[in-house]
UniProtKB/Swiss-Prot annotation:
GO terms for cellular component: adherens junction; cell-cell junction; membrane. The chain crosses the membrane at residues 21-41, 81-101, 113-133, 150-170. This is Transmembrane protein 47. It comes from Xenopus laevis (African clawed frog). The gene is tmem47. Belongs to the TMEM47 family. Keywords: Cell junction, Membrane, Transmembrane, Transmembrane helix. GO terms for biological process: cell-cell adhesion. It is a multi-pass membrane protein. InterPro entries: P53_induced.
Length: 179
């Protein structure tokens, strides 16, 4: 009597672990926050008299706003390039992470996603440190100013990217067999 080998074989598939799923959610949140930060009109505000974004600088003169492009200043272009570069890398990492869910062998995608996210974090931290240093150095406002929600969104995106990178760095061999 012949026995069927198909009933005895152990089929082993790579299961999506909760940490990698949370990592993917972190990457998605970072991407959303980056989009909000780049499009935000409020990076620096000053008593309803002045506001600065990554794209334009506006001053209130009498009862109307006068706006100029910020893409004429080297440090503002550098900040924008660093943030957009980081956002592009986060987008690629998100797509690779999303694709890795659909393919059978996910482990080979963990390291590239983590490396991309760490690279994005480095770019964004450089841009977010450069921005206030050069702003304070070059812009002289006689009134109280504060860094606003657009700048905060960019920091939030950086923190979520870092969290996603840490989650994708965790060694899957140590815990994947339990899921």
């Amino acid at each position: 009597m012949a026995s069927s080998a198909s009933g005895m074989e152990e089929v082993r598939s790579s299961v999506l672990t909760p940490l990698k799923l949370v990592g993917l959610v972190c990457i998605f949140l970072a991407l959303c926050l980056d989009i909000g930060a780049v499009l935000s009109p409020a990076w620096v505000t000053a008593d309803n008299q002045y506001y600065l974004s990554l794209w334009e600088s506006c001053k209130k003169s009498e009862n109307r706003w006068i706006c100029d492009s910020t893409l004429q200043s080297d440090w503002q272009i550098a900040t924008l390039a660093l943030l957009l570069g980081g956002a592009a890398i986060i987008l690629i990492a998100f797509l690779v992470g999303l694709i890795s869910i659909c393919v059978g062998s996910r482990r080979r995608f963990y390291r590239p996603v983590a490396v991309m996210l760490f690279a994005a974090v480095v770019l964004q931290v450089c841009g977010l440190v450069l921005y206030p240093i050069k702003f304070i150095e070059t812009v002289t406002l006689k009134i109280y100013h504060e860094f606003n929600w657009g700048y905060g969104l960019a920091w939030g995106a950086t923190i979520f990217s870092f969290g996603g990178a840490i989650l994708y760095c965790l060694n899957p061999k140590n815990y994947e067999d339990y899921y």
